[in-house]
Amino acid sequence: MSPDPHRVPPRLPVPPERLVGRVLRIPPDRCRYRDRTLLLRVTRVRIVISQWYGGDWVWLDGDEIDLHGVALATVSELVHVSACAPRPPASP
């Protein structure tokens, strides 16, 4: 049986396990179905259900947090893989 050409794992810039526990600042153009920036503390990367987006999008579960780190809601979000890249450290 040949692999399904429509199933492509997400092309994440880091291994999925390195995303768990991280806080991502996701701009609205990198998160489907959102119209404002999302602060997300990642609890799970859903590789299996993310294979239908050409490798460009991934489903992330996590806690939406405010600027103080307080959890507002538990969410599942479809995020562009570019939003999962490590951010460079802030310069002093």
Question: Where are these predicted regions, by residue range?
Answer:
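Short, intrinsically disordered, low-complexity terminal/loop segments
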Residues: 1-4, 90-92
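Short alpha-helix capping/helix-loop boundary micro-motifs
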Residues: 2-14
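Beta-strand elements of modular eukaryotic interaction domains
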Residues: 14-15, 50
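Short coil-to-beta transition motif at edge beta-strands of beta-rich domains
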Residues: 15-43
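Short edge beta-strand segments in beta-sheet-rich domains
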Residues: 37, 57, 74-76
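Short, conserved beta-turn/loop elements at beta-strand boundaries and strand-helix junctions
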Residues: 46-53, 67-69
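Short aromatic-glycine-enriched beta-strand elements
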Residues: 54-61
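Intrinsically disordered, low-complexity, charged/polar segments
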Residues: 61-92
